[in-house]
Amino acid sequence: MYEKPSAPRPVGGVIDDAIKLYRESFRRCAPIGVLGAMVSTAFDLMVIELAHREGLPLTSLEALVRVYQEPPVMALNLLQIVLLLALFGALIVTQNAVSNGEPEPLVIQALGVGFARLGRCVIAAVISMVLILVGCLLIVPGIYLSGILSLWPIAMYVDDAGAIQSLDASRRIIRGNWWHASTVLAVAMLIALAFSMFAGFVAGVIQLVSGAGAAGQSMVQIIGAAANVFLLPMLPAAMIALANDVKQRQRLAGAPR
């Protein structure tokens, strides 16, 4: 059972807390994860349909790049990202309630918060991405900014901060704990990546056995959608566990000695 830390936790302890929070909150997050999987699957199917209509086989990287450069696909991809940002916020709201031992919010309530704050979420996401990309031109600043700004969604969906305020809140939360926070998030992303690669491997094996026909492609889509239901709540759980740990570190650092 997940409990907020009463003392600073090592990296492994925070990951363990994140896993506990993920498991405890999964039942509540599953409907939101299903919606996210539906959004991603719908986008994939539209890309496949467009490729077939244009006579572009999706058997090479070059063909795939050409399809994704089509204006309709680019517009649909932006729409997918915006919708997933709202669902990401809804997952944070739901998992934060679990971490605080609060009554279970209805799915519609969590979605309402996710979409109500979508405007400021998009602004914060764009600003943070621009800052990180510009910083990446000098390598080190980009790496630093990717860590120091990583908890802005928590500030926005837990503390109801604005777009700029959430970025500043993330900076203040992580300041002094950059290595710790970056390591936790890196481990969490590696776990999610490993799960995604495993699901892709299973889908590839099934498609190899079933062939490249409609049945094989349908099985791949089903496996991908099912994997997304489990995958989408992973990072929010890690971010909440990390935020709770870092806040505890700051409280102890500011306590009188």
Model-derived segments and spans:
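Low-complexity, intrinsically disordered, cysteine-poor segments enriched in small/polar
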Residues: 14-17, 21, 74, 113, ...
